[in-house]
Structure formats: C-alpha cells, structure tokens
C-alpha cells in the first residue's frame, strides 16, 4: 500500500497566503499512484472559528481522487484549554459535520 502524507496546508478563502500551493500538490498526489492520502492537521488557517475556512478546504480536498483521511489540527478545532481557541464539543461537532470523522 502506498500512502501519501500531507500536513499544515493552512488554506483559507480570506487569507490566501498558501492557496497557490494546492494545485501543484493535488496534481502530484493524483498522479502518485497512492492508495491513501492522510492529511495530518492544520487543513485551514482558522477552521477553529470559521466554517467558511473548513468548507473552502474541503472543496479543495475533493479534487484529490484518492481516498483521504483528515486528522484535525489546532488550526482546525482549537488548542489547549485556557487558550483563545480551546478544543471543545462545539468545535469538534462542527468539524465532524463539515469535514467528517476525526481520526
């Protein structure tokens, strides 16, 4: 089994610093012959607070024609308790509804 691992893409419709990295990466992944892609977190810039960031990112991820698992990172669902964006049930529920299960 061939697995491609990607991480920390930090995509956003409103803060597009890294969005230009996507198309070359998606083209490479689709041509890689991989059986599975695992994105290991920080899919979005501010997915912890912005539905539109996660929705935008999932539109990009759908361009990959290989099965993909996405692990949420701190930019996706929040960070430590006491931080400005702590992980909580609301953020995790939103992630699951917009992205899918967390692994």
Residue spans for each PLM region:
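N-terminal active-site segment of His-dependent metallophosphoesterases
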Residues: 1-56, 60, 100-102
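Extended active-site neighborhood of metal-dependent phosphoesterases/phosphodiesterases
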Residues: 52-103
């Amino acid at each position: 089994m061939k697995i491609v691992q990607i991480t920390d893409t930090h995509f956003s419709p409103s803060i597009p610093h890294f969005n230009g990295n996507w198309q070359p990466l998606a083209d490479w992944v689709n041509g890689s012959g991989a059986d599975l892609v695992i994105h290991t977190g920080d899919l979005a810039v501010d997915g912890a607070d912005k539905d539109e960031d996660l929705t935008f990112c999932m539109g990009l991820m759908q361009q990959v024609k290989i099965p993909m698992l996405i692990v949420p990172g701190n930019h996706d669902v929040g960070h430590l308790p006491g931080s400005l964006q702590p992980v909580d049930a609301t953020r995790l529920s939103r992630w699951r509804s917009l992205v899918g299960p967390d692994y």
